[in-house]
Amino acid sequence: MAVKQSAIEDLRAAPDRKKISVIVTTFNEEANVAECLESVLWADEIVLVDSFSTDRTVAIAHTFPITVLQRQYFGSAAQKNWALDRVQHEWVLIIDADERVPEALAREVLTLLATDPAINGFYIRRE
């Protein structure tokens, strides 16, 4: 389920909107990575950190307008913390390749980043 870029272009173009990076962590996720990345194309930056997959994960990731990095796996927290030092924006959403960001959530995040200067974080319940 790809988030339609045209549906959220106005939110992305909002002046003074805080920008957001998305971090996606992967290892042998060729079955999931394309759908995951399609669901976050609304973000200002996407960084995928792969743990040297032996399947087509990295090749698929390279077909998207994202940054692909590889790093030996030292645990989930270590991968995500390492990736945090490599993104450009203060706002960061971290997801695994088997997760998706529904369009409604993308709109809500972008709306709040564009309209609520007091917001300082999100809690997103996993379903």
Range-by-range predicted roles:
Residues 19-21:
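Cell-envelope/extracellular polymer assembly enzymes that use nucleotide-activated donors
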Residues 24-42:
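Short, well-formed alpha-helical segments that are part of the catalytic scaffolds
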Residues 34, 55-64, 104-105:
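Acidic helix N-cap motif at the loop->helix transition within catalytic regions
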Residues 39, 50-59:
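A conserved acidic beta->alpha catalytic loop
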Residues 51, 95-97, 104:
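Active-site acidic Asp-centered loop
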Residues 72-87:
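Glycine-rich, basic loop-to-helix element that forms the pyrophosphate-binding segment
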Residues 76, 100-127:
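Conserved donor NDP-sugar-binding/catalytic core segment of glycosyltransferases
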Residues 92:
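Short aromatic/hydrophobic "clamp" motif used to bind/position activated sugar donors
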